[in-house]
Amino acid sequence: MAAAARARVTHLLRHLQSTACQCPTHSHTYSQVPGLSPSGKTTDYAFEMAVSNIRYGAGVTKEVGMDLQNMGAKNVCLMTDKNLSQLPPVQIVMDSLSKNGISFQVYDNVRVEPTDGSFMDAIEFAKKGAFDAYVAVGGGSTMDTCKAANLYACSPHSEFLDYVNAPIGKGKPVTVPLKPLIAVPTTSGTGSETTGVAIFDYEHLKVKTGIASRAIKPTLGLVDPLHTLHMPCQVVANSGFDVLCHALESYTAIPYSMRSPCPSNPIQRPAYQGSNPISDIWAVHALRIVAKYLKRAVRNPDDLEARSSMHLASAFAGIGFGNAGVHLCHGMSYPISGLVKTYKAKEYNVDHPLVPHGLSVVLTSPAVFTFTAQMFPERHLETAEILGANIRTAKIQDAGPVLADALRKFLFDLNVDDGLAALGYSKDDIPSLVKGTLPQERVTKLAPRAQSEEDLSALFEASMKLY
């Protein structure tokens, strides 16, 4: 009898180990046969987490001089933009560097929404300066520019397109050692302090692209919530929309075990690997913070709890998407911002037309998640509930519309522009918008549902008006 009971228990355990859990949280395809997709194509069997060291705390920026001293830095490049160069975050960094005897030069010509031209200007400054460390103080534009400057200054014989993502660039792996880079984010959106990604507008083709490599992630991110108090309300909102979509897209991305090809060498495994059990945790937690705090952070500039929470959410979502990736909202956003006509966002002090990155991302989100919900609908319903939807009576086949409605309500409550038409786009622009999305295969291929050019056209058309 005892032997028979043991045999039954052993059989049951083997069955449980070979059967994927079907609850909403664990029903993703992580348990399929490694290395082989249902279609027979070779797929990946592993994922890895690459994250910058993060230090969080009110006033933590003043430690930057000690950090650089501990690193042995003697000649530091401090990168920022013209608007921030006279504001407290930069002044605090300069005071800390001076107090700790660190020699530094300031580069304050970073462009909001950088271009290949602005990247190359910063790269030239970095090459001439022969710096042994970098500090980036600002939003994603500053941090991304600094990553690129560090990379190409350490690889002076490389051509600019060598490290740029294919198909626009050659997408070569980064094998050269880089200098230490400390990132001090002053906005709560990009999560760039945690990622090995640097995004820019490639002006010749009028598309956004970037550099993606774990090697370029910052050495340390100093996440100081005091810097969030200076942010205008519209900047808070648009930055928060980036966090929102980072979380939603990484959580609904194709699982890492379904992504192909499987790399022949670990160095070829992309930074954006597909959703995975670790990134999922960060994405969901970030989404809960956005749902609870973003509206408060926008409506009350003095709400330190809300703005501090959003600053952390940006880093959390960065950890998630920095390893899982994003997909259609981001892939479609690049031509939206790159083909901007005359639109100038409120509360952005720039001398050129500008669609803020977070706004360009979130405007397509209702259409995108209606489209993608055919795959992994449980995850779409789960995120809709986090955003406030009542899903108790929702049918699984309605997951897309339920999430889309939750997003529309969220955006409407924050007075977001009524779709792409409000930015100056019309149906006549859709072919150009689709053309600008096609080179973004690095992210669009992570969408849980494949898309044709006709699908992209329909998504842009559905995003012309939200309400």
UniProtKB/Swiss-Prot annotation:
Enzyme kind, highest EC tier: oxidoreductase
Q: Which GO terms describe its molecular function?
A: alcohol dehydrogenase (NAD+) activity; hydroxyacid-oxoacid transhydrogenase activity; metal ion binding
Tissues where this protein is expressed: Expressed in kidney and liver.
Q: Which domain of life is it from?
A: Eukaryota
The processes (GO biological process) annotated in the record are: glutamate catabolic process via 2-hydroxyglutarate; lipid metabolic process
Which residues are recorded as modified (N6-acetyllysine)? 445
Q: Does the keyword Transit peptide apply?
A: yes
Of the GO CC terms on this record, one is: mitochondrion
The UniProt keywords, alphabetically, are: Acetylation, Lipid metabolism, Mitochondrion, Oxidoreductase, Phosphoprotein, Transit peptide
EC numbers: 1.1.99.24
Phosphoserine (modified residue): where? 452
Q: According to its UniProt record, where is this protein located?
A: Mitochondrion
Main location class: mitochondrion
One Pfam entry for this protein is Fe-ADH
Q: Please list the reactions this protein catalyses.
A: (S)-3-hydroxybutanoate + 2-oxoglutarate = (R)-2-hydroxyglutarate + acetoacetate; 4-hydroxybutanoate + 2-oxoglutarate = (R)-2-hydroxyglutarate + succinate semialdehyde
Name the job this protein performs: Catalyzes the cofactor-independent reversible oxidation of gamma-hydroxybutyrate (GHB) to succinic semialdehyde (SSA) coupled to reduction of 2-ketoglutarate (2-KG) to D-2-hydroxyglutarate (D-2-HG). L-3-hydroxybutyrate (L-3-OHB) is also a substrate for HOT when using 2-KG as hydrogen acceptor, resulting in the formation of D-2-HG.
Question: Which protein family is it in?
Answer: Belongs to the iron-containing alcohol dehydrogenase family. Hydroxyacid-oxoacid transhydrogenase subfamily.
Q: Can you name this protein?
A: Hydroxyacid-oxoacid transhydrogenase, mitochondrial
